[in-house]
Amino acid sequence: MAISALEGLTAAVKGRVVDRGDSGYDEARALYNGMIDKHPAAIVYCVGEADVSAAIGFARERGLRLAVRCGGHNGAGLASVDDGLVLDLSSMNEVTVDPSARMVRVQGGAKLGEVDRATYEHGFAVPAGIISTTGVGGLTLGGGVGHLSRGGA
């Protein structure tokens, strides 16, 4: 995708947009599984819901494939896409604990370690995976195994 085609996207979002012409592109497209070597047209570092909405609209209007990256841990590389748009949610990582309701509110880009730290302060434990850099969005949708996972059949 030409840089001029991305101008509408960079103007529509507050977060940073990294494309193939940027010096940090290879680092920005890297995933947890180093064997995955996908080359998205651009990576959008969303800073809020408005960025997510604008990036999705941009991709839809142009017929671009879309991938959402929280932690980038999916073994098959589903957090990236060749020639499409990657929405990186890592800046949307707020974790709020309501101890009286025994409830946690987590934004899509939060990592498991951030959730563990926030809940631990209130004496809570999260039955989730054990790799602290795993994105909670992917963990929620794809699952994971951790110390508090149910055992047996």
Feature locations, PLM:
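N-terminal accessory segments
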Residues: M1-G151
